[in-house]
Structures are given as structure tokens and as C-alpha cells.
């Protein structure tokens, strides 16, 4: 095999990649799709707000349920702890999403 022949065959591809790299380095606005990045950020921020609201509701319901079971049904503490821990883990999902998105 002739290495020069292989190089000549891939030369247009290398030139195209070099041109794309040069354009993306000099014109970063093209890479951001004309404001599309801000729309995605706004959408993700609204998802985080919804997750925070759901997490507050989930933790509140879990604690109310646990208190009801302990006070009125005389449930074992170990049975109630599982539900409270699950509620806290679900409630932490909004903050984990916030941490990953920022």
C-alpha cells in the first residue's frame, strides 16, 4: 500500500474538518444555535421548580403519614422509618437535579 495515496484520499476530509473547527472556534454564536441555549436553560429551570414543589409535598406527606401511624396506629418505628427515608430520598431529587444542572 502506498501511504501517500491514502493521505491524498483523506485530504478533502481533513480540510473539511479543519474548516469546521476553525469556524466553530471563531464563530461561537453558531454553536449556540441563536438563543436556543437560553430556552433550554429556562425549560430546565422550570423543571427544577416543579421538582422542588413535588419534593416538598412528598416529604410533607411522608412525615404526616409517619406521625399518623406512630400516634394512632401504634406502628413500629422501623416500619415508619422506611417511609420517611424514602420520602426524604424522593424529596432530595430536586436538589440533586439542581446540583447537576448548575
Curated annotation (Swiss-Prot):
TM segment ranges: 47-67, 77-97
Pfam families, A to Z: TrbC
Superkingdom to which the source organism belongs: Bacteria
Endpoints of the signal sequence: 1-33
GO cellular component terms listed in the entry, alphabetical order: plasma membrane
Recorded topology in the membrane: Multi-pass membrane protein
Subcellular location: Cell membrane
Nucleus listed as a keyword: no
UniProtKB keywords: Cell membrane, Membrane, Signal, Transmembrane, Transmembrane helix, Transport
Induction: Cotranscribed with ptxABCDE. Activated by the two-component regulatory system BvgS/BvgA.
Membership in a protein family: Belongs to the PtlA family.
Task of the protein: Component of the type IV secretion system ptl required for secretion of assembled pertussis toxin (PTX) through the outer membrane.
Protein name: Type IV secretion system protein PtlA
Originating species: Bordetella pertussis (strain Tohama I / ATCC BAA-589 / NCTC 13251)
Lineage, broadest ranks: Bacteria, Pseudomonadati, Pseudomonadota, Betaproteobacteria, Burkholderiales
Amino acid at each position: 500500500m502506498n501511504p501517500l495515496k491514502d493521505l491524498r484520499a483523506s485530504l478533502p476530509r481533513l480540510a473539511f474538518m479543519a474548516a469546521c473547527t476553525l469556524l466553530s472556534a471563531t464563530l461561537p454564536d453558531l454553536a449556540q444555535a441563536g438563543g436556543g441555549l437560553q430556552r433550554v436553560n429556562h425549560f430546565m429551570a422550570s423543571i427544577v421548580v416543579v421538582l422542588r414543589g413535588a419534593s416538598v409535598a412528598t416529604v410533607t406527606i411522608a412525615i404526616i403519614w409517619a406521625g399518623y401511624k406512630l400516634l394512632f396506629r401504634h406502628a413500629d418505628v422501623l416500619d415508619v422509618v422506611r417511609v420517611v427515608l424514602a420520602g426524604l430520598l424522593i424529596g432530595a431529587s430536586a436538589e440533586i437535579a439542581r446540583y447537576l444542572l448548575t
